[in-house]
Amino acid sequence: MPSILSIDGGGVRGIAGLVLMKRVQEALDVPWPLWRFFDFVVGTSVGGVIALDLAIGQHSLEQSIARFLGWVSDIFPAPPSGMPVWRHKLRQFWAWVARDSIYDSERLENVMKEAFGKTQHLFSVEGQHWSGIKLGIMATEVSRSELRIFTNYNGIGRCESDSGKPTDMTDWQNVKFRTGYKLLRPPVVDEEPLVFEVARATVAAPPYFRPKQLRGHEPVQDGGLRANNPSEQALWELSAIWPGHARPSLVLSVGTGYHDTPPHKLATQSAWRSRGMPRIVRSFMMSPCLHGQNSWKALLNRLDHSARKSFIRLNLEFEDEEPALDNAAEIPSLRARAESCYIDVVLSQTSIWASAFFFELTGRPQLFCGYYICHGVILCKFEDARQLLRAIRKAYPLHQLAVGTQGLVEFGTAGDYCGECGLFQQRIRLETKTLLTPVDVALHYDTHTRRHLSSFPNSIEWFVARQSASGEFRTWESVMRCACKRTSRKRRVTWTSSSIPKRRRCY
């Protein structure tokens, strides 16, 4: 099953999200970046720019933090020294009236051009990272105030016409219609948006910046007006990108900070805050569309208890009011708070590790003495799994694999991977009375920590249907094989197709 990385918007508070991800990255203790563990990366506003910088720019989190600080200093210049606050606010107000933006929108565009180049398209050969990771960047259409998503993929049910029916679909019966939002894909290839244009559009928050006009589209503005936390929107897209995958194996949602007013302060709020206009503004700002944390709570309320275990939220709680989106002076404080605040790093670490492993049947189930015997193999998303196995072994020396009802077995031993190329393949056997009964395989780190592998728990029937989608039963051996010279299972990987990436698309 696919995994999702979602990054909230929040202006300068984006530094908090970067630092929180960096803390998880350090806990993973692997040489590749955090985002490579995920199949679908989505972002809104500054979260969208960060997603582009990581997945398209292929920068590390350390590099992205440094680049972020440079962008902020260029886009949000400090007020003149000695200028009274009231006068600075008055200047900003008149700038907004005169040019429809407080800050220079041309400067923002130039910063994005310098960051992402002037020629790279989001949907192009060079824009598609070899890993095959899908990207979704949120925006809001100005005229209708509806959600739009920039993508580097098509999906089966690409978009809807004004009549509400899909304009391009390959399977009319099985495509899940997109309702209330569309993918921003132009009718002709020449009008494909450039990466810097997508970055410029997703952060065009009123009144700070003007909307962005793109060829072949209506003007668009900040995606945070409709989905400041794009986690749920990513779930909407799952069935269009990966038909047959109704739920993700893991969702890591990264916030940029929030503030909950304590009850005792609510009881003593001024009479002015209880009047009509402040109530309207407060309700608007706290709505799930704009408030990332409230959006997350609403999403969890729609999930059952078992599904919630796959949803992880990283966020920072402020004791006082949230810093303004353009308050660059708060960045040092934001960074320090994000480095010291509590987040469940162990939950993120162990869940991400487990999501990197998935199961494939090596043959159809066989009925024997009232039980279906199912032979299969545990594989890894990464071609070379040695560094990942080393990190798991270092943190949890006694880790094992919990296989269905059979109990615990060894996991990641020297006989389960190639010592020359690192290809991981651990064969296991599952037993079940019915093909429709969910079975489970999990990484058992210690007596208190156990995480499901990708696609578990699930029925054997689900695996059979997935591997038979093309009409014939396909196994991992039909996609790749290891051809290293045999020296106690030391083998080299030989891909049967040159299009297969180093990070596998099988999950």
Regions found by a protein language model. Name each.
Residues 1-507:
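Conserved catalytic cores and adjacent C-terminal regulatory segments
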